[in-house]
Swiss-Prot record:
Belongs to the BLOC1S4 family. InterPro entries: CNL1. This is Biogenesis of lysosome-related organelles complex 1 subunit CNL1. The keyword Zinc does not apply. It comes from Lachancea thermotolerans (strain ATCC 56472 / CBS 6340 / NRRL Y-8284). It is found in: Cytoplasm. The lineage of its organism: Eukaryota, Fungi, Dikarya, Ascomycota, Saccharomycotina.
Length: 131
């Protein structure tokens, strides 16, 4: 069997001694917590910067499309289509108003027709009695 490497044994011992010394210097792990906190802030800042760059690129692309007229044409087409739909809605509303007026007229005809039918029956009875 080979003898253990004297250097590796000492390195292991010194790491243990350093960890133990650190534990006595920072028993609550405040130093480690501070390092972790700083790293977390760095990662958050990195993520925010990444989002900012992506957003800036998307805005640049959209602006370029608007400048090229691609989106402008689509918007104009959509606006024109909406105007046509609104015009059809107004026409439908006019037709519904007409139907309401016709319904009102029909409602006034019913009592008048009932009166005419009643008068006709009376006249028919009176005419039959005379004959």
């Amino acid at each position: 069997m080979s003898a253990p490497d004297s250097n590796s044994g000492h390195a292991h011992d010194s790491a243990q001694n350093e960890g133990a010394a650190e534990g006595t210097r920072d028993p609550f792990g405040i130093d480690r917590l501070s390092v972790d906190y700083d790293y977390l802030l760095y990662r958050i800042q990195d993520h925010v910067t990444s989002i900012q760059l992506s957003t800036t690129e998307i805005c640049r692309q959209q602006n370029q499309l608007v400048e090229q007229g691609i989106i402008g044409d689509a918007i104009d087409i959509n606006i024109e289509e909406m105007r046509r739909i609104l015009q059809k809605c107004e026409e439908l509303e006019t037709h519904f108003d007409m139907l309401d007026q016709i319904d009102s007229i029909v409602q006034t005809f019913r009592p008048r027709l009932d009166d005419i039918v009643r008068e006709h029956r009376e006249l028919t009875r009176n005419t039959e009695r005379r004959i």
